[in-house]
Amino acid sequence: MSGTILENLSGRKLSILVASLLLCQVLCFLLGGLYAPLPAGHVTVLGSLCREDHGRQNDTGFLLYSRGAGACIPVTREEVEQDSTKMANELVHVFQMPLPRDLRDLDYSRWQQNLIGVLQVEFGYDSSSELREPPRELQLTIDMRLAYRNKGDPDNGWKLYAHGVEHRYLDCVTSHVGPTETLYSCDMIPLFELGALHHSFYLLNLRFPLDTPSQMNLQFGHMHDLTLTAIHQNGGFTQIWLLLKTMLFPFVVGIMIWFWRRVHLLQRSPALLEYMLIYLGAALTFLNLPLEYLSLVYEMPYMLLLSDIRQGIFYAMLLTFWLVFAGEHMLIQDAPNKSTIRSRYWKHLSAVVVGCISLFVFDICERGVQLRNPFYSIWTTPLGAKVAMTFIVLAGVSAAIYFLFLCYMIWKVFRNIGDKRTSLPSMSQARRLHYEGLIYRFKFLMLATLVCAALTVAGFVMGQMAEGQWDWNDNVAIQPTSAFLTGVYGMWNIYIFALLILYAPSHKQWPTMHHSDETTQSNENIVASAASEEIEFNHLPSDSNPSEISSLTSFTRKVAFD
């Protein structure tokens, strides 16, 4: 067997390759750090109060807006306080997005991809009321109507996007105690999530119906300020992200074709590690495919779910590959048969499969339902919030356990390699130099794998926490920087690109020599290599199994000769 390119590539060429890949890695970090804005931005909108006619309350096509021709006449807080019924069942809280700036109307761009809304509620009781601390988990019923219009539409050309009557549960604390009323401020609650930001303007109407027979919203005194936080992906970050995907996609496809072609030129079936590399490259190619360009033309509310599925497939394949990659370099073959996933790694991978399926089910339960009802959220009920939080915590703990187990496997690889180095002094000088060079290369590659795994786990945990921070606590501020995101994404591509090159079969043909001539020829190679500026780690003739991908994995079966 000719071995892999990692074994046969000269020191100078390998150094040039590694330096080039490290330079690309630095450029990926700089691309996000210098040119991309923060991944997400948000705007805070204070609700406007409008009063509607009783006859239009059940008309879902009737929408009130606060800016433009035909806007509603705003109701002041003083007018509400002076009304004997506090305008019950007549008030509509209006939120029009985005807000104008410098007397100029702004609009959303399709580059911003998605929109998430969370609401902070403030309500009050008369100070004469005996209630001083509201009970926890107050159930609030909200009639929500979300509408949109585009550039060129008239000011009153709002079209209904979604309508629903939803329940939210509030945890509140006392914020102000006055002579006439006591105010309570509540934690943020998830309101809606749009997987596609296809239209220019959005309008949200909120009603809080009161009904005595069904005890609907009677535990609240009267609503005060409502604050909507609208979170969107920054368009500048999306452009940098798609630029990175567009540049990386053809390189990965090209190197996969090159790798698989070299494998099929061999007179053997592909090894397990070669299959795993091509599967990993396919998962990365699916992730790199810049499908987001389609959302600039078509409305694709399922893009968030599709992105989660693509990233989940890549994570599953990457985690699987690392376990197999470390296992194949253990240098311990329990059986002479060819390694398969089912025979050697099913115990290791069962946890990965269960974890990925659990996260997929969790994602489908939320974002799958949101395709039909953007107001749905698993965080809206106390039980759902606990289940969601449990999933996130378990995902983080599982990621940490996986990383520790991978560290243990790589440590075993290092220990096994160290144990086998004790046989090097009994070998000929040529073979000893050959294997010492291979050992250094494989150790460096294993350390690079460990760094890649650590950054991947850190990025996964930060992503889960950043996604849920608006749902569990408004005081948490976790947002991965653009440099970190583009750097980690580039690292995945560079790492897999390097593996496909280094583990491709080498087609160098070395002349066959008799055993009696090998020592003389090896010594001549050593002298020539020492005098050369470029040292070649030549593959020495051996009786290695042709099904093995690397000569290092057959190290234990090599017989030293002089």
Curated annotation (Swiss-Prot):
GO function terms (MF aspect): Wnt-protein binding
Keyword Iron-sulfur applies: no
Keywords: Cell membrane, Cell projection, Developmental protein, Endoplasmic reticulum, Endosome, Glycoprotein, Golgi apparatus, Membrane, Postsynaptic cell membrane, Segmentation polarity protein, Synapse, Transmembrane, Transmembrane helix, Wnt signaling pathway
Keyword Transmembrane helix among record annotations: yes
Cytoplasmic topological domain residue ranges: 1-13, 261-270, 333-344, 412-441, 504-562
Membrane topology classification: Multi-pass membrane protein
Superkingdom of origin organism: Eukaryota
Annotated function: A segment polarity gene required for wingless (wg)-dependent patterning processes, acting in both wg-sending cells and wg-target cells. In non-neuronal cells wls directs wg secretion. The wls traffic loop encompasses the Golgi, the cell surface, an endocytic compartment and a retrograde route leading back to the Golgi, and involves clathrin-mediated endocytosis and the retromer complex (a conserved protein complex consisting of Vps35 and Vps26). In neuronal cells (the larval motorneuron NMJ), the wg signal moves across the synapse via the release of wls-containing exosome-like vesicles.
Name this polypeptide is given: Protein wntless
Species annotation: Drosophila yakuba
